[in-house]
Amino acid sequence: MSSNGDSVKYDTNFDREGYSTDSSNECPNQIDDPLNGIPNSQNSENFQLYSRNNNANELHETFPTTIPIAQQVHLSSFRNSGMVNSNSRSIGPDGSIYSIQPFDRALLQRNFIPNDEMTSNMSFVQMLNSANYDQIEPAFYQNMPGIGNSFMMQSILNPNPNDQEIDNPISDNSTYVLVQGDSNIPTNPQSNPINPTYVSLDLNDCRSNMFEYPSQTGHQYPDINGNGPRLLHCKQELSYPQTNISPFDYRLSRSMQSNTPLSSYKLSLPEIKTISNDWIKGSQNVNFNQNQLLRSTNVSDYTLIKNLPQNLPNPNQTDSIYSSSINENNQPIRNYDSPNPDREDDSEIHENPNPHDTSSVENNDNENSSSGDIGKKRKRRVLFSKKQILELERHFRQKKYLSAPEREHLANLIGLSPTQVKIWFQNHRYKMKRAHHEKALEMGNLAVNRRLNQSMFNDSKSHLPGNFELGINNSFYNSNLALGNLSLNPAVNLMGRIPGMSSMLPTYPNGSQSYFNNINQATLTGSNSSWGV
């Protein structure tokens, strides 16, 4: 125990059996135990703490305290037993921050009553920042044995997890029981206390302990290891669950066992207010909001699991842009209903031209086994009735892409599954795109052929005589042949005007210039005198 002014610091160090690890015959100085005196009835209105030294008058009404939570806690904050007025000051009538849990060993024959938040396993240990205690007024049931002569029970309950830091999560229903003191012998305020009983909690093995101090006339400074108080483990198992909180979920991978100490964890006690008989009768649990928790990093005996939040799709969300399915290997497949033809589902759904023919469902498993691909099976074709096809086509003309609710509505309307409707729309969009593509190719081919024919026709016309009346331009002929001013014979001119006679005109190949140059010039001159050179 270290004392500084009006403060006391507890650095207790007990083994799992609840006894001091110091082998000396007296309690070590760093251990604070109120064994140096029991306050009498004249001090009944004051909550008193007595240190280990011989100064019985050393009083600490407020003190910052640090307690090893995983070790035996002897926070013997107590006062003498005795009856007090039932009109004592109450704790938390306005919703105080603490839950004080009294007990009555004389009536209930047990020394501890756990809170409802306690379960069977201890899953996480945390730390509180230091705080000061106010003095605690005693509270007793009127005309009954004294209960809660001195007791403190701290419930770490955080109703607003969003206020806490990410690295310092706390449970929203964890409960840490530190100390409960009791007097099992009813006395009046004027009598001397006799064998007051105190209860502490051995967080090392998650069991509460009861020990009795001798009377004031006995050992004034008893030895914890020898003639001092005898520790008795109660049968009530305690635990402190850690529940899921946001933004992260921390929990230990295995429970706290009785032989697994966590000596590295420490707990500082926040402020405690006064209690009274009225509050004890009316409530057993009062929540408080403690946002300043520090988590120890020494968890070598455990595996700390940190579950990060994952933004996974909600399978129940009807307006999702995709639907999930399971393939033959139990692996999820996402079928996107998007205009991208590369993501089209390869399932086959075919139309049945005969709505009354239901026997035409094709299942060619035997044919596939004989074709060489034994491991591959052809998918069963789904045949639609004429009524279903008409309804599907009508909706397709209205809307090329259906949302999930629209698919489900249409499927219920025509007696199909939403997947069948989706695949039909995918196949129909693919067929429409393919038809448009083929039509575009066909139109392109026609345009190309038209341009080729026009080019060939223009090339053939360019080899005719200059004044051949076909309404064409003879500049190509005049510029390339360079034959001078050739005038056609009237007979030749007439041949171009008479139907059926134009086929008798000479036809020139592509190399018309070389071909024409090879013609005998004399032949041209002699054949018709009207041709001039």
From Swiss-Prot:
It comes from Girardia tigrina. Residues 377-436 bind DNA. The keyword Nucleus applies. PANTHER family: HOMEOBOX PROTEIN NKX (PTHR24340), HOMEOBOX PROTEIN VND (PTHR24340:SF82). SMART domains: HOX. GO terms for cellular component: nucleus. This is Homeobox protein DTH-1. Keywords: Developmental protein, DNA-binding, Homeobox, Nucleus. Residues 308-317, 360-371 have a biased composition (Low complexity). CDD domains: homeodomain. Intestine and unidentified peripheral parenchymal cells. Slightly higher levels in the cephalic region compared to other body regions. The gene is DTH-1.
